[in-house]
C-alpha cells in the first residue's frame, strides 16, 4: 500500500471517528436523550479497529454513559476495565486517571468493602506523579474513602502529601484546600493542638496569599466553618460567637445575586477546579452550625427557626438534584430538632422527627447513612424513653449507643444519661461503676466543656440524692463556673434549680430563692419545661414557708399547668405508632406509620444563615448537656 493510500485511509478513519463521536454526543444531548443510539454510535467505533488511545477513550466514554444513564453496572465495569488495561501502560495519557477515578466510584457502589477502590486509586496515584491536577484529584478521592472508613491517619497522610504537591506546583488555593481538609480530619481525631496549628497556618495564607477575592472569600467560609466547629466541639459557645458572626457575613456575601457562579470562579485554571462544597450547600451548612450553636447556648426557639429554614432550603436543592450530602444535612438537623422538642416538652413531635430521621437513613443506598447514624438514633430514642419514664427501654438504648459508637463525646453523653437512670432507679453499684469509668476516661483527655460540666452536674445530683449537700454544692458550683464562662444557658438553669433544691433541703430559703429565680428566668427564655416544672415546685414550697399565700397559689398554678402539658403530651406519645421505636435494639429500625414530622414552614430568607464530605472534591459535625431528668 502506498504512503498516500495509507494517509488517505487514516484520514478517512479519523473522519469516521469524529462523525460517530459527534453523532453520539448529538443523541446524548437530545431532549429527551436517546441513550440507546448514543451507545450504538460509540459501539460502532470499535468496528474500525481504532488506535489504542482512541479505543481506550471510547471504552471510557461507554463506561461514563452507562453509569450516568443506565443501571447496567456490569457492562459499565467491563468497558472501564478494558479502558484501564489499554491506557495504564501508555505514557502521558490522562484517560487512565479518569478511568481509575470512575472505576473506584463504581467499586464503592457495588462492592461490600472499599479494598478494590483503594487499590485502584493507589496505583493511579503512583502513575500520576508528573500530572499535578490528576495527582491531587486522586489523592483527595483516596483520602475521602479512607476518611469514610474511619482510617483517619491514612487520610491525613494523603492530604499532607497533597499539600506538598500543591505547594511544589505553586498552587496556593489548592494547597489551602488540602490544609483545611486535613484540619477537618485532625478535628475528628481530636488532635486539637495540630488542628489549631493547621488552621492558623491556613488562615495566614488565606489573608496574605490568595489574590483572587472570590476564591479568598470561599476559602474563608471553609476556614470559618472549621473554626466554629472546633470551638463548638470544645463546648465554647461564647468564644465562638465572633467567628460565627463572621461566617454568617461571609455566606451572605457568597450568596448575593451579584456573586459569580462557582464555574466562573473555579473554571479558569485546572489547579483551581476544586471545591469543598458548592455555595448552595455551604449555605445549608452555615444554617446547620448556627442550629448547633443555638442548641448548645440553650436558645431552642432560635434553633427551631433555623432548622425550619435549613430544611426548606434542603428541599429546594433536592428538587434540583438530590445529592447524598443533602440527606446527611437533613439527618443532622433532625437530630438537633428532636433534642429541642424534648427540652420544650414536645415529645410526641420528637418521636415523629426521630421516625423522619430513620426514614432518611433507610432511603440512603446500601444503608450507608443508617450505619453512620444508628448510634445517634438509639441515643435519641433513649432520651425519648427516659422522658416518657420507660427507664428499662432507655437503658438498653443507651447501652446499644455506647457499643455502636466510636465517638467519645457521644459515648460520654450516653453514659451520663445512663448514670441518671441508675440514680433514679436506685442502682448504686451500676452508678458508681459508670461514674468511675467516665472519670477515668476523661481525666487526661480533651472533652467538650458542656459535657464535662454535665459530668459535674451528675455528680452533684448524685451527692444530693445521698443527702451529701456540701459535696453537692461543690460539684454544682464547678458546673456553674464552666456553664457561665461559656454562656451554656441550659446547663446554668439546670444547675441553679438543683442548687436551689439543695439549699431548700438544708433550710436556707433565702439562698434557695436566690438560685431558683434566675433558673426560672433562664428556663422561660430557653424555654425548658422540665426546669420550669421543677422550679415552680420549689417556688411553691418557698412561698408557703414565707406564708406568701398569693405567690404560693401562682406557683402552684404554674406547676399544675406545666404538669398537665407534659401529661397530655405523654398521652399522645403512647398513642403514636412511632412509639414502637422504643423497642428497636438491633438491625434495621422498624417501619412505623403515623402522622409525618411537623411540616417545614416556608419563611422569608434569613439575613444570617445556619457527617459534610471530609475532603474537598473537584468542581464537577455535638450534644449539649442538661437537666435532672436527662441530658439533651
UniProtKB/Swiss-Prot annotation:
Localization annotation: Nucleus, Nucleoplasm
Q: Which InterPro entries match?
A: MAU2, TPR-like_helical_dom_sf
Q: Which GO terms describe its cellular component?
A: chromatin; nucleoplasm; nucleus; SMC loading complex
Q: Which domain of life is it from?
A: Eukaryota
Keyword Nucleus (UniProt): yes
**Gene Ontology annotations of biological process type:** axon guidance; cell division; chromosome segregation; maintenance of mitotic sister chromatid cohesion
Q: Which residues form the TPR repeats?
A: 453-486, 493-526
SUPFAM superfamilies (UniProt xref): TPR-like
Which Pfam families would you find in this protein's record?
A: Cohesin_load
Q: Which UniProt keywords apply?
A: Cell cycle, Cell division, Chromosome partition, Mitosis, Nucleus, Repeat, TPR repeat
**Function description:** Required for association of the cohesin complex with chromatin during interphase. Plays a role in sister chromatid cohesion and normal progression through prometaphase.
By sequence similarity, the record places it as follows: Belongs to the SCC4/mau-2 family.
Relate the assembly described in the record.
Interacts with Nipped-B to form the cohesin loading complex.
> What is this protein's record name?
MAU2 chromatid cohesion factor homolog
Q: Which organism is it from?
A: Drosophila melanogaster
Amino acid at each position: 500500500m502506498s504512503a498516500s493510500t495509507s494517509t488517505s485511509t487514516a484520514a478517512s478513519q479519523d473522519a469516521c471517528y469524529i462523525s460517530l463521536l459527534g453523532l453520539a454526543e448529538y443523541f446524548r444531548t437530545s431532549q429527551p436523550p436517546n441513550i440507546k443510539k448514543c451507545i450504538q454510535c460509540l459501539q460502532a467505533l470499535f468496528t474500525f479497529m481504532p488506535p489504542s488511545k482512541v479505543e481506550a477513550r471510547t471504552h471510557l466514554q461507554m463506561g461514563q454513559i452507562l453509569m450516568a444513564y443506565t443501571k447496567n453496572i456490569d457492562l459499565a465495569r467491563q468497558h472501564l476495565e478494558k479502558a484501564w488495561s489499554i491506557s495504564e501502560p501508555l505514557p502521558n495519557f490522562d484517560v487512565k486517571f479518569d478511568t481509575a477515578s470512575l472505576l473506584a466510584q463504581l467499586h464503592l457502589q457495588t462492592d461490600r468493602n472499599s479494598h478494590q477502590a483503594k487499590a485502584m486509586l493507589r496505583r493511579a496515584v503512583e502513575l500520576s506523579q508528573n500530572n499535578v491536577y490528576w495527582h491531587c484529584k486522586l489523592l483527595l478521592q483516596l483520602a475521602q474513602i479512607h476518611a469514610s472508613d474511619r482510617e483517619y491517619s491514612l487520610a491525613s497522610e494523603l492530604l499532607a502529601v497533597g499539600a506538598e504537591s500543591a505547594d511544589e506546583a505553586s498552587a496556593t488555593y489548592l494547597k489551602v484546600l488540602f490544609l483545611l481538609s486535613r484540619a477537618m480530619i485532625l478535628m475528628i481525631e481530636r488532635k486539637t493542638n495540630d488542628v489549631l496549628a493547621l488552621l492558623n497556618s491556613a488562615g495566614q495564607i488565606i489573608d496574605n496569599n490568595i489574590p483572587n477575592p472570590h476564591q479568598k472569600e470561599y476559602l474563608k467560609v471553609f476556614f470559618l466553618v472549621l473554626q466554629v466547629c472546633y470551638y463548638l466541639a470544645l463546648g465554647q459557645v461564647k468564644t465562638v460567637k465572633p467567628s460565627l458572626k463572621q461566617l454568617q457575613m461571609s455566606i451572605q456575601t457568597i450568596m448575593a445575586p451579584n456573586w459569580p457562579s462557582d464555574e466562573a470562579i473555579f473554571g479558569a485554571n485546572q489547579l483551581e477546579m476544586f471545591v469543598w462544597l458548592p455555595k448552595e450547600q455551604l449555605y445549608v451548612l452555615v444554617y446547620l452550625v448556627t442550629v448547633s450553636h443555638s442548641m448548645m447556648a440553650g436558645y431552642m426557639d432560635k434553633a427551631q427557626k433555623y432548622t425550619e429554614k435549613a430544611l426548606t432550603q434542603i428541599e429546594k436543592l433536592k428538587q434540583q438534584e438530590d445529592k447524598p450530602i443533602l440527606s446527611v444535612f437533613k439527618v443532622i438537623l433532625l437530630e438537633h430538632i428532636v433534642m429541642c422538642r424534648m427540652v420544650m416538652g414536645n415529645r410526641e413531635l420528637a418521636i415523629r422527627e426521630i421516625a423522619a430521621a430513620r426514614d432518611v437513613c433507610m432511603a440512603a443506598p446500601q444503608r450507608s447513612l443508617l450505619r453512620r447514624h444508628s448510634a445517634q438514633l438509639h441515643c435519641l430514642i433513649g432520651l425519648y424513653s427516659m422522658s416518657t419514664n420507660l427507664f428499662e427501654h432507655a437503658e438498653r438504648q443507651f447501652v446499644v449507643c455506647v457499643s455502636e459508637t466510636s465517638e467519645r463525646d457521644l459515648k460520654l453523653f450516653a453514659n451520663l444519661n445512663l448514670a441518671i437512670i441508675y440514680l433514679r432507679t436506685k442502682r448504686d453499684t451500676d452508678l458508681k461503676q459508670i461514674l468511675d469509668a467516665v472519670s477515668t476516661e476523661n481525666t487526661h483527655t480533651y472533652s467538650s466543656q458542656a459535657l464535662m460540666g454535665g459530668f459535674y452536674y451528675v455528680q452533684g445530683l448524685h451527692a444530693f440524692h445521698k443527702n451529701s449537700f456540701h459535696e453537692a454544692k461543690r460539684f454544682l458550683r464547678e458546673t456553674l463556673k464552666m456553664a457561665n464562662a461559656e454562656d451554656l444557658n441550659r446547663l446554668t438553669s439546670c444547675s441553679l434549680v438543683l442548687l436551689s433544691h439543695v439549699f431548700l433541703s438544708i433550710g436556707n430559703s433565702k439562698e434557695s430563692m436566690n438560685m431558683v429565680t434566675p433558673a426560672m428566668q433562664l428556663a422561660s427564655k430557653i424555654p425548658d419545661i422540665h426546669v420550669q416544672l421543677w422550679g415552680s415546685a420549689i417556688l411553691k414550697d418557698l412561698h408557703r414557708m414565707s406564708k406568701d399565700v398569693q405567690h404560693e397559689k401562682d406557683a402552684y398554678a404554674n406547676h399544675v399547668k406545666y404538669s398537665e402539658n407534659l401529661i397530655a403530651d405523654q398521652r399522645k406519645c403512647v398513642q403514636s405508632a412511632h412509639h414502637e421505636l422504643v423497642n428497636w435494639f438491633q438491625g434495621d429500625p422498624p417501619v412505623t406509620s403515623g402522622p409525618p414530622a411537623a411540616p417545614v414552614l416556608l419563611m422569608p430568607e434569613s439575613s444570617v444563615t445556619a457527617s459534610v464530605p471530609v475532603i474537598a472534591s473537584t468542581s464537577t459535625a455535638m450534644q449539649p448537656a442538661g437537666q435532672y431528668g436527662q441530658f439533651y
